[in-house]
Amino acid sequence: MSSAVLLLLVCGCALAVLSPVAYGAPMDTDDRPVWDSIRLCDIPNEPNPGQCMLPAECVAYGKINDVSSLSSIERFSFIKQIQCNGSDTVPYVCCPRDSDAYREPYVNETMVPKNRVASRIAFDADSCGIQSYVAKIRGGQLAEIDEFPWMAMLLYERDNNALTQGCGGALISRTYVITAAHCVTGKNFQQTKGRLKFVRLREYNIHTNPDCVYENDLKDCSDDMIDLVPQAVIPHPEYDSESSNQQHDIALIRIEQTPPFTDFLRSICLPEQNFESSATPGKKLSVSGWGRTDIFKDNLGPDVLSPIKLKLSLPYVEREKCSKTFRPWSFALGPGQMCAGGERAKDTCAGDSGSPLMSYDMKRAIWYITGIVSLGVRGCGVEGLPGVYTNVHHYLPWIKMYTGA
């Protein structure tokens, strides 16, 4: 493998640059599990089961996967419901076995609004790390409409042009968002990314506002998205944008106080202990954001960020193994960095730079921010090459100096 493929990057818009081998190309048939060819699944409005397969191999899916579909509640809800658990490493969709087209590619529900009052009063008004989302059997990389309500999208403006999404972040209090330092500062930063204009909260689908989905005979709509003006941008004082290892890649953005928390807006908890001190190799972590995915690749292209909030599960990689992996390229893992990923076609292309790496405490039913998407390799999901994240626990004293939390 050439050194160019393995070159560590600091990505301004998303974690890594896709390569066909790593993320875009279908798996060779010989690499697939035997059950993959007979995995059956349900398709809305069709009496016969479909087959779980790669989006690029489903002719019917190619006919409905376009930008206009993402603006239609009925069509987008259909696309969400045909996600399936064909593989743990790449997105799959349920494809008709006896036709090259879906019979009725939309979900026409009764449009009765979902009542969310009960879930809103079940939690303390300011509690962190809690979400109303309940895991469903259906798989896929598209997040649910109320999943990870602390996610933030950073919007940039250059030369008075339209706003562009560039990085992610996470709400950690009513007035602070945490992100990567390289998302807010650095050499020639404004020339390459533009000026940080807004922090967007309560976003799910950038093509609609408010965002709605049909599920279980109900129409579920989020609160309107909100764009908040940054009051102060605080990169870590030791961050050096020209450093090859990008240590201290962490920043805080102070915003005006958010509206009251709801199912669609809540902060994530800061870690109470160092995740690495008790984690076992392979322990699952989660990442979310508006990164890259094969779900919309054929229509939007491989290098376009997703308009829909994504999610992905990643394995923790122990420090010694990660350091050994990058040693040939003279990359030294700093005390404030950690690693995750490194499985084939499974890395944080789904999450923008600055997005949170999250851990879930099952006993307390609380989400914690463990890391921040920082460094990646050329090609998301290159087997054996994990992504590098800023370890949030290492910077707690610095964070609390500003937030007071």
Swiss-Prot record:
- Keyword Glycoprotein assigned: yes
Which top-rank group of organisms is this from? Eukaryota
**PROSITE patterns cross-referenced by the UniProt entry:** TRYPSIN_DOM, TRYPSIN_HIS, TRYPSIN_SER
User: Keyword Repressor, does the record have it?
Assistant: no
Q: Which GO terms describe its molecular function?
A: serine-type endopeptidase activity
Uppermost EC category: hydrolase
Q: What is its main location?
A: secreted
List the glycosylation sites.
Answer: N85, N108
Q: Which residues form the signal peptide?
A: 1-24
Q: Where is this site: Cleavage?
A: K136, I137
The name of this protein is CLIP domain-containing serine protease B8
Native source organism of the sequence: Anopheles gambiae (African malaria mosquito)
Q: List the top taxonomic levels of the source.
A: Eukaryota, Metazoa, Ecdysozoa, Arthropoda, Hexapoda
